[in-house]
C-alpha cells in the first residue's frame, strides 16, 4: 500500500502524476483549521505534506501523528515550526538551488528600475506628461561603477554579485556570517562590518532569511547610516526590516529610494505610505515568479518528498540530523 500524502498546492499535471506514482495523494485547498477538521481522517493518516505559503505549526502536527516528511515549494521556511518538526523527527525539505538565478535577476531589476526611475517615468508617459524633450526632473542615477553592498552572501548574493561585477563594473562590498573566499576571488568583493557597508554603499541589497536574530535587523539606526543618495533593496524577507523605519527614512530623505519585493505584511496594505511614494518600486514578492522557475521549484519539491519518504536526505533538507 502506498504511503498517504497531502498536497495543499496545485501542481502541473505531469508532476502530480509523478507524485501519484509513489503515493496516495489527497489534495486540499489549504491548511486552515476548517480544512483540517473536514479532512481529519486524511490528516491523521498522512505521512507526507507538500505545498507552500501555509503555516505548519505544532497545532497542525498534533493532527498528523504519522507525518514523517514535509516538502515546501520554496527556499524560505520561516512559516514552519522547525523546532516542533525536529522534536517529532519530521524531515523538512526545501528548494534552495532552483531559484537562485531568477531571484538574482529580480534583484538586479529592482536595482535598475529604482536607479533609473523606470516605473515612475513609464507611468508619467502613460499619463500624457511627455510633451517635450525631457529635462532633469526625469533623470535617474547611474548604476554602472557604483558600489553595491550585499547583506547576506549566499547563493543569491553570489549570483547578484556576478551580475553586478561583470555586467556593470560595480565594486562589491558584503557582510555575512563568515568571509566568502570565492566571492573575494571571483568578484574582488570586500568583506566589511555592517556599519561600514551601510556608509560606503550606493546600493544596499538585503538578502537574508527571517530568523529570531534577523527580525528588524534594519531599522532607524541602520537607515541613518546610509548615504542620502543610497538606494535600498529588499528581496529577502519583509520582517527583517522595520517597515515604519524605512518609511520614515524615505520621507525624511535619509535614503534616496527603495526597491521592495517583500514586506512585513503580505499582501501589502493598499493604505501603506510606500505605495504613494514615487521613489519606491514595490512588487508583489515576485522573486522566483517565472513560469520556468516555479515549475522547477515544484519538480524539486516533489522529488524532495519522494526522497525523504524513501530515507534519502543527502540534499535540500533543513534538519537532516533527525534521520540519523
Curated annotation (Swiss-Prot):
Matching entries from PROSITE patterns are given as: D_2_HYDROXYACID_DH_2, D_2_HYDROXYACID_DH_3
Enzyme type, top EC level: oxidoreductase
Per its UniProt record, what CDD domains does this chain match?
Answer: GDH
Q: Which InterPro entries match?
A: D-isomer_2-hydroxyacid_DH, D-isomer_2_OHA_DH_cat_dom, D-isomer_DH_CS, D-isomer_DH_NAD-bd, Glyo/OHPyrv_Rdtase_B, NAD(P)-bd_dom_sf
Gene Ontology cellular component terms for the protein in this record: cytosol; plasma membrane
Q: Where is the signal peptide?
A: none
Keywords, sorted A to Z: Cytoplasm, NAD, NADP, Oxidoreductase
Q: Which residues form the active site?
A: 237, 266, 285 (proton donor)
Its EC number(s): 1.1.1.79, 1.1.1.81
Cellular location of this protein? Cytoplasm
Q: Which family does it belong to?
A: Belongs to the D-isomer specific 2-hydroxyacid dehydrogenase family. GhrB subfamily.
Q: Which HAMAP family match?
A: 2_Hacid_dh_C_GhrB
Described function:
Catalyzes the NADPH-dependent reduction of glyoxylate and hydroxypyruvate into glycolate and glycerate, respectively.
Q: How does it assemble?
A: Homodimer.
- Protein's name in the database: Glyoxylate/hydroxypyruvate reductase B
- The organism named in the record is Escherichia coli O17:K52:H18 (strain UMN026 / ExPEC)
